[in-house]
């Protein structure tokens, strides 16, 4: 099976890019992935509505190539030149199959696009994100983690910030590790900490191996995201053996937590995810 995955977005960080990289690696036994539309292919898999253009997908439709749309959340028009939701709607109408990242995403988005579909929960690369491996030593203990790929307000850093202040008062030797993108003002003014709190900023990291080292070295993850459809960061942290502290339990986090508690870390692996995708995609091209 040869699959064309459009990859036209200039952004190189985020869930869509991580998913493409993971899917490519774990589907290699049964699929060949191309990002070149000129190459002959059996199927078009849209990893996210903001990853490609209407023109690209119209061409697929004209060539009668089966189209599969993967949906996580409603794209923000404010971040996509006012075209995010209209692109999502059009792609859904043209798709032969829609795959939602979580049951929450299906419940939220299905009434808008009026297209039923499957639910396949995300999985992460279990060969990288695992309890075994290098750990980073810290003179402080316990280590709390807060990580956000982007500065979207729904990540709610302010909640982690507020709660960590109280954690620090109760645990003077604790430290907060911060990973990801933050405003220049946060970086300049010590993330608004004002009582000598212990913290370390690791920067925006696009190296999965280093991320795994950080995640497995942390004791707790302060999870604050509001209605994230299926947090890759949360899944990766679970696979590394850490313990999330849910300061917000909304969106797909409910399902991730339930699946982990019912089936263990194996359910959150890319192996399980790609097995389910294989079955779904084979049904489209038969």
Where are these regions (language model features)?
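Aromatic "clamp/platform" in nucleotide-sugar-dependent glycosyltransferases that forms part
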Residues: 225-226
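Conserved donor-binding/catalytic core segment of Leloir-type glycosyltransferases
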Residues: 135-155, 161-168, 177
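Short alpha-helical donor nucleotide-sugar binding micro-motif in glycosyltransferases
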Residues: 92, 213-218
């Amino acid at each position: 099976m040869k699959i064309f995955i459009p990859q036209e977005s200039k952004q190189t960080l985020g869930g869509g890019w991580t998913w493409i990289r993971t899917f490519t690696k774990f589907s290699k036994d049964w699929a060949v992935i191309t990002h070149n539309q000129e190459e002959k292919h059996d199927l078009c898999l849209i990893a996210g509505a903001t990853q490609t253009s209407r023109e690209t997908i119209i061409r697929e439709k004209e060539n009668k190539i089966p189209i599969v749309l993967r949906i996580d959340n409603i794209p923000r028009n404010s971040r996509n030149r006012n075209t995010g939701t209209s692109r999502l709607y059009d792609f859904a109408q043209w798709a032969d199959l829609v795959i939602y990242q979580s049951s929450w995403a299906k419940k939220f988005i299905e009434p808008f696009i009026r297209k039923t579909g499957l639910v396949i929960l995300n999985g992460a690369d279990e060969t990288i994100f695992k309890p075994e491996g290098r750990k980073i030593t810290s003179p402080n203990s316990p280590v709390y983690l807060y990580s956000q790929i982007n500065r979207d307000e729904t990540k709610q850093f302010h909640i982690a910030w507020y709660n960590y202040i109280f954690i620090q008062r109760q645990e003077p030797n604790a430290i907060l590790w911060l990973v990801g993108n933050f405003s220049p003002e946060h970086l300049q003014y010590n993330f608004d900490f004002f009582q000598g709190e212990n913290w370390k900023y690791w920067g925006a990291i696009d190296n999965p191996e280093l991320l795994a080292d950080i995640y497995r070295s942390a004791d707790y993850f302060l999870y604050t995201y509001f209605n994230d459809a299926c947090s890759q960061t949360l899944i990766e942290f679970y696979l590394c053996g850490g313990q999330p502290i849910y300061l917000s339990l909304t969106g797909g986090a409910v399902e991730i937590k339930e699946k982990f508690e019912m089936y263990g870390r194996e359910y959150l692996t890319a192996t399980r995810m790609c097995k389910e995708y294989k079955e779904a995609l084979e049904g489209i091209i038969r």
